[in-house]
């Protein structure tokens, strides 16, 4: 989990969701698990207290095979600032992919990395951002454009859709 200015309550929010849901998809341990190719998600979360998180995330694993979500996020103060952060992250998708592949993250290197060409957010993502009502989140897979719109606070069901197990 990386952010320019990680606050205690930010860390609590993410840790609470990840810890609550990380073991929820292991009900039948003897079934054969198939792993899908790496999916990198661009997201925006709107919380009840008016806070917004925008970021990029993917499932990752350490050298001994433990799986965990890797998240890099911003905490913008407005919708225009949210759009700026999303476009910036989308343009740095190759750098994010390299971080996942190499297993090393230096936040300054990420922010200073080269950007790719055009960054396009789906119309559905724009609609979510412009909708000022409600608590929820929007997740767009950056390669194929698949998306998930989730009402309410992040749930274990959403966690498993994004990160599997």
Summary of predicted features, one role per range:
Residues 10, 18-21, 45, 132, ...:
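Short, isolated positions within intrinsically disordered regulatory regions of eukaryotic proteins
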Residues 25-60:
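Short, structured protein-protein interaction patches enriched in aromatics and acidic/basic residues
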Residues 1-39:
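N-terminal ordered "arm"
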């Amino acid at each position: 989990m990386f952010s320019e200015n990680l606050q205690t309550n930010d860390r609590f929010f993410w840790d609470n969701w990840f810890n609550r849901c990380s073991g929820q998809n292991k009900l039948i341990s003897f079934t054969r698990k198939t792993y899908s190719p790496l999916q990198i998600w661009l997201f925006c979360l709107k919380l009840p207290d008016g806070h917004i998180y925008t970021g990029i995330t993917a499932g990752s694993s350490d050298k001994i095979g433990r799986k965990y979500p890797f998240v890099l996020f911003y905490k913008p103060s407005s919708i225009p600032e949210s759009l700026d952060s999303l476009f910036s992250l989308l343009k740095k998708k190759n750098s994010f992919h390299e971080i996942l592949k190499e297993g090393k993250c230096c936040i300054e290197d990420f922010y200073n990395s080269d950007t790719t060409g055009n960054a396009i957010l789906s119309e559905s993502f724009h609609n979510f951002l412009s909708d000022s009502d409600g608590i929820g989140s929007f997740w767009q897979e950056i390669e194929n454009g698949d998306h998930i719109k989730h009402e309410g606070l992040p749930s274990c069901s959403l966690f498993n859709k994004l990160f599997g197990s």
